[in-house]
Amino acid sequence: MNLKTTLLLIIGGGLGALARYYISGILPVYKDFPLGTLLVNSIASFILGYLYGLLFFGFEVSSEWRIFLGTGFCGGLSTFSTFSYETFSLLREGEYLLAFMNVVANVLVTITLVFLGFILARR
């Protein structure tokens, strides 16, 4: 890995992490449901779907943008570990329905948004 790639990852990941911090801070929990985590994972999924949709449909996206936006920003923005911890916490607190809803919402919403981003890139 060269210096340029390293810097793109550091800057993209740092900006994604900052965005996650502020978005999750605005919407940390809604009636015991971790809405902030769902939102950041959803945004990152849409962006990643759109980015790779552009590539699939033949648009030129430089490797720098893929590294900066895809791996860096989306990687810093999304958070599987927080999602896992919040689900575990809900289970530990006996909030089984909310834990189930959190898993279903994160999986279905994020996959749907990857698909939507991918399709919208075609236009």
Curated annotation (Swiss-Prot):
One of its GO terms (molecular function) is fluoride channel activity. InterPro entries: FluC. The chain crosses the membrane at residues 7-27, 39-59, 67-87, 100-120. Na(+) binds at residues 75, 78. Na(+) is not transported, but it plays an essential structural role and its presence is essential for fluoride channel function. It is a multi-pass membrane protein. It catalyses: fluoride(in) = fluoride(out). Keywords: Cell membrane, Ion channel, Ion transport, Membrane, Metal-binding, Sodium, Transmembrane, Transmembrane helix, Transport. Fluoride-specific ion channel. Important for reducing fluoride concentration in the cell, thus reducing its toxicity. This is Fluoride-specific ion channel FluC. It comes from Pyrococcus abyssi (strain GE5 / Orsay). The gene is fluC.
